[in-house]
UniProtKB/Swiss-Prot annotation:
It holds the Pfam family PEPcase_2. The lineage of its organism: Archaea, Thermoproteota, Thermoprotei, Thermoproteales, Thermoproteaceae. GO terms for molecular function: magnesium ion binding; phosphoenolpyruvate carboxylase activity. It comes from the Archaea. It catalyses: oxaloacetate + phosphate = phosphoenolpyruvate + hydrogencarbonate. This is Phosphoenolpyruvate carboxylase. Its EC number is 4.1.1.31. Belongs to the PEPCase type 2 family. Catalyzes the irreversible beta-carboxylation of phosphoenolpyruvate (PEP) to form oxaloacetate (OAA), a four-carbon dicarboxylic acid source for the tricarboxylic acid cycle. It comes from Pyrobaculum islandicum (strain DSM 4184 / JCM 9189 / GEO3).
């Protein structure tokens, strides 16, 4: 059984959830939210190493069929980007949880482990071998029959996603025997931070389009997972106003992340609608996409986006320091994201804080692609993009309700705001922030003000 709904521990809600509360939260995800998979997050996060075992034991006591109908899937730190010992301790925690689940229930609670920020085959090979070695050691010393968890590569960079076939092929070569399938995780958020909304959205659509031919060439079934949240910049698939469109735009998925904001910042009825929309569009064939033309646009859009962001990097960093943390994550100043443009490398916050910071500056981050959109419109190529991304215009229209040129000018520049307005004129979008949200935007920034805007939007970032 391959899970369809992956409940996550993302800090995109305005509600604070501590690591201690995440054990009970996992059981609620299974029973109340209908998720069949819970992702325990160790990437840039101080999650206790006992959490997988604690959830396993509590699920057993509650009579939940963990490892049969419900699954636990840790996301480990990437040993290339974080401390090596944290990566290894996460693997240890996963195998130890399986030891207990086999003893208690006769089956493994953890069938998969997610490796994030995958860009190279060497790290995939290292983690794969360590999983084998650690599992073999437990079998030898305890006599308990265990299977090593399978590795899920999480690719979170637009350029790397376009080379997903090479990464999958490289992983298969590391394996002693060919598996029946691979779950491929495509992340929207970090890709958007690095390359912008336009490039990251096109890259995922293009990658999904290629999967059928990749399956044929490699002789293996691929089950794509979409890592997306509520704001359009982060995929929009959890958004009650957009999910019915995003599930069509990103068709070809098998599993979707159900992040914190859609569970805690929307009504339960809204959540159910999002859940059913995701499930109803699951597992359909991906769309045919004209890849060569799109790859050229992806490269150009990414380059233009980066040149915009580095101009306002200091403002983003200042605002990011005001964004409240709603999970026990490591500070983005320690584990952040780098953007390189114009011979300058800038350290940016992780995706949720980054997204929230742009909204707090009166400029939804999807609008950072305005120079590219205007150029595409003038060169009669915008229709090509809108065909590949049929939800795009609706996403911009949705985000326009959180846009205030006056506030955006104060944090960015009048010249850039003019380009944003020109883009919206091309698209015939006249909506702007008004009423309560506009009042909040024009107040002084502090944590309470940012949380209030997040509650209004129904997501922090």
């Amino acid at each position: 059984m391959i899970p369809r709904l992956m409940c996550t521990q993302h800090p995109d809600a305005t509600v604070k959830v501590t690591a201690n509360e995440e054990v009970d939260e996992a059981l609620v995800a299974y029973t109340a939210y209908g998720c069949d998979e819970v992702m325990i997050d160790y990437e840039g996060k101080t999650t206790p190493y006992s959490q997988p075992k604690d959830i396993t034991v509590k699920a057993y006591e509650a009579g939940l069929p963990l490892g049969e109908k419900f699954f636990l899937t840790p996301r480990m730190p990437n040993p290339r980007l974080e401390e090596f010992e944290r990566s290894m301790l996460t693997l240890e925690a996963a195998i130890l949880a399986n030891y207990f689940s086999v003893k208690l229930m006769g089956r493994q609670a953890i069938r998969w482990i997610v490796l994030p920020m995958v860009t190279d085959i060497e790290t995939l090979g290292l983690v794969y071998r360590m999983l084998l070695h650690k599992t073999e050691a437990y079998i030898k010393e305890t006599g308990v029959k265990l299977e090593p968890p399978e590795l899920i590569p999480l690719i979170e960079d637009a350029i790397a996603q376009l080379k997903a076939d090479e990464l999958i092929s490289g992983l298969l070569k590391q394996m002693a025997q060919q598996p029946q399938y691979i779950r491929l995780f495509l992340g929207k958020s970090d890709s958007a931070v690095r390359h912008g909304h336009l490039a990251s959205a096109l890259a995922i659509v293009a990658t999904l389009s290629k999967m059928r031919s990749v399956e044929k060439s490699l002789g293996i079934k691929i089950y794509p997972i979409l890592g997306m949240g509520s704001p359009p910049f982060r995929g929009g698939i959890n958004n009650p106003s957009l999910s019915h469109l995003e599930t069509i735009q990103y068709v070809g998925y098998y599993t979707v992340t159900v992040q914190s904001a859609v569970r805690y910042d929307t009504s339960y009825d809204e959540y159910i609608k999002v859940r059913e929309t995701i499930l109803n569009a699951c597992c359909l064939p991906s769309r045919e996409i004209n890849l060569p033309e799109l790859e050229e646009i992806i490269t150009k859009a990414s380059s233009t986006y980066k040149s915009v962001v580095v101009k306002f990097a200091d403002r983003i960093v200042q605002m990011a320091r005001l964004i409240p943390g709603t999970r026990d994550r490591i500070s983005w100043t320690v584990y952040g994201r780098n953007i390189t443009a114009e011979d300058r490398v800038v350290n940016m916050p992780r995706a949720i804080v980054y997204t929230s910071a742009w909204y707090a500056m009166g400029l939804p981050p999807t609008f950072l692609d305005a120079p590219t959109v205007v150029e595409l419109a003038k060169s009669d190529k915008l229709d090509l993009v809108l065909k590949a991304l049929p939800s795009l215009r609706r996403e911009w229209e949705y985000d326009a309700q959180f846009y205030d040129p006056q506030v955006a000018s104060r944090y960015t520049s009048e010249d850039f705001v003019k380009v944003v307005n020109e883009m919206l004129d091309y698209l015939g979008i006249n909506l702007r922030a008004n009423g309560t949200y506009l009042s909040l935007l024009r107040m002084n920034r502090n944590e309470s003000n940012i949380l209030a805007m997040g509650k209004y939007r129904k997501f922090l970032g």
